[in-house]
Structure formats: structure tokens, C-alpha cells
């Protein structure tokens, strides 16, 4: 009887001190390199007591809304200038907690082989958010298609164009949707990882690209300010930076072409 009671008590003790329940971390992402690379860290995070759940979004507004509301713990889809603009517009209390991929963006055309071939009155698709629109316009300026007011930098908009010799017109599109509209326009701003994910066309066929000089546009892990010092969130970023599986997923998401991205950490 004493032996049976001892076994019962021992079993109860084992249950009470058994494996700690994994902490669930919900990370908001958009499809492509960001989702794929975060998904790659899930097994390593699980081994360290973190149960990572991906929440995919199809736009660039909802991930910050969801984060501010506490529906997710992190998001990973935006760069610092984009976050700064969102905070200024919406009053979010969000902060960066880690840096990730620097995605080099490009100008693509399925109709013209270079900027010189672009006809008068051409239609150009460009991002509709303030920061990424400015980045696209700077690329078009580098390509000789337009000229912007001095000093506007990446904060420039279509209204800041002061010279447009070919009288091109612009179609403003939500960033993730640019890949779908590319066949229907003369030129389009493009994000290589979205192009790869959509299997739309060759992501290495851009007429011009941004580069490492654009490091301020590296994608960041973002959290609510009150959770910025969370050990679990810091661990996610640490695993992301060190994991070979993450690096493999990033390379694959960019068609294994190193000119399309940079590891910014």
C-alpha cells in the first residue's frame, strides 16, 4: 500500500514538474520572403520553448492594426521609414526590436527592354504608400524617366515630379498587388520576393534596382512598446539571425540571386 501511494505521489510530482508549456508567439507577415523565412525558424523556436504561429496578411495596413490591438505579438513586413510614417498617421505605440532582410526593389517591364524604349504616354504602376512610392520615384529618376524636386528623397510623391519628358502617367497600387498588374502596364515598381512567390516572371529581369545604400529600408521585427524587452521576442530575433534554415529560406525566396537582397544584421 505504501509503495502504491509512493508511486502515485511520484507520478503526480513528475506531472507537476514536467515540460513547461511552450509560449505561443504570433507573428504577422505578408506572403513571400518574410513569411517563408519566419516559418523556417519554427522548429528551432519550438526546441527553445516557443510555439511560433504565423498570421498572414495581404496588405500593409492590417499588420500594424493587429499588433497595436494585441492580436499578434510581432510583425515582420515593414521597414523603419514605413513604420515611422504609420506611427505619425495612426499614433501607434510600436517599436522596432530587430532587423532582418534588406529587399532590393526594382523597376520591371514585360514590354520594354530598357528605359530608352519606354514610349511617350507610358503607364507606370507604383506603390500607393508614401515611403515606397518615393523609393520607386527615385529609381525612375535614376533611370532618366522623370526628375523630382531637389531634396525630397524617399519622401517624394508624384506631386513632386518637376520634369516628365515622356509624359508618363501613374497608377498607384497597394505594394503587394504590384506584381499582378505588371503585365498590364509599361513599367512597374517590383518587389523580387513577391515576384518569386507569385511565380509571375523573372525577378532578376529588372531594369534597375536599389542596393545596400538603402539599408534604412531593411525589414524590421516590430512589437508593441510595452513588450519590447520581452525575452521571448528577443529570442525570436536571435534565432532568425543565427539559423542556417532561415538563410536558406531567404535565398530561395529571392531566387538564389544575391543582387536581390542583403542580410542587414
Protein language model annotation of sequence segments:
Residues 104-115, 217-232:
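A bilobed periplasmic-binding-protein/Venus flytrap-type ligand-binding module shared by bacterial periplasmic
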Residues 85-97, 111-112, 184, 189, ...:
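Ligand-binding "clamshell"
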Residues 23-32, 50-56, 123-124:
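Short, well-ordered beta-strand elements
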Residues 97-147, 247:
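A conserved helix-loop-strand patch within extracytoplasmic ligand-binding domains
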Residues 60-92, 106-108, 113, 136, ...:
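Pocket-flanking alpha-helical
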Residues 132-141, 240-261:
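Periplasmic-binding protein-like
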Residues 32, 56-60, 70, 74-84, ...:
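Beta->alpha turn/N-cap motifs
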Amino acid at each position: 500500500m505504501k509503495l502504491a501511494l509512493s508511486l502515485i505521489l511520484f507520478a503526480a510530482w513528475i506531472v507537476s514538474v514536467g515540460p513547461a508549456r511552450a509560449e505561443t508567439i504570433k507573428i504577422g507577415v505578408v506572403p513571400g520572403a518574410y513569411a517563408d523565412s519566419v516559418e523556417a525558424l519554427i522548429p528551432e523556436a519550438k526546441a527553445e520553448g516557443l510555439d511560433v504561429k504565423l498570421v498572414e496578411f495581404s496588405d500593409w495596413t492590417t499588420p500594424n492594426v493587429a499588433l497595436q490591438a494585441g492580436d499578434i505579438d510581432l510583425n515582420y513586413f515593414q521597414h523603419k521609414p514605413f513604420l515611422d510614417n504609420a506611427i505619425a498617421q495612426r499614433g501607434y505605440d510600436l517599436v522596432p526590436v530587430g532587423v532582418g532582410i534588406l529587399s532590393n526593389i526594382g523597376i520591371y517591364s514585360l514590354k520594354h527592354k530598357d528605359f530608352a524604349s519606354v514610349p511617350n504616354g507610358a503607364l507606370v504602376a507604383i506603390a500607393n504608400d508614401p515611403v515606397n512610392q518615393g523609393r520607386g520615384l527615385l529609381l525612375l529618376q535614376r533611370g532618366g524617366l522623370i526628375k523630382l524636386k531637389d531634396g525630397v528623397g524617399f519622401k517624394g510623391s508624384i506631386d513632386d515630379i518637376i520634369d516628365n519628358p515622356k509624359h508618363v502617367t501613374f497608377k498607384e497600387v497597394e505594394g503587394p498587388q504590384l506584381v499582378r498588374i505588371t503585365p498590364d502596364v509599361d513599367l512597374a515598381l517590383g518587389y523580387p520576393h513577391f515576384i518569386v512567390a507569385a511565380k509571375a516572371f523573372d525577378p532578376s529581369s529588372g531594369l534597375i534596382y536599389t542596393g545596400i545604400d538603402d539599408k534604412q529600408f531593411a525589414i524590421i521585427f516590430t512589437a508593441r512598446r510595452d513588450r519590447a524587452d520581452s525575452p521571448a521576442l528577443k529570442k525570436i530575433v536571435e534565432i532568425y539571425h543565427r539559423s542556417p534554415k532561415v538563410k536558406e529560406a531567404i535565398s530561395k525566396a529571392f531566387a538564389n540571386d544575391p543582387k536581390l537582397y542583403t542580410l542587414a544584421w
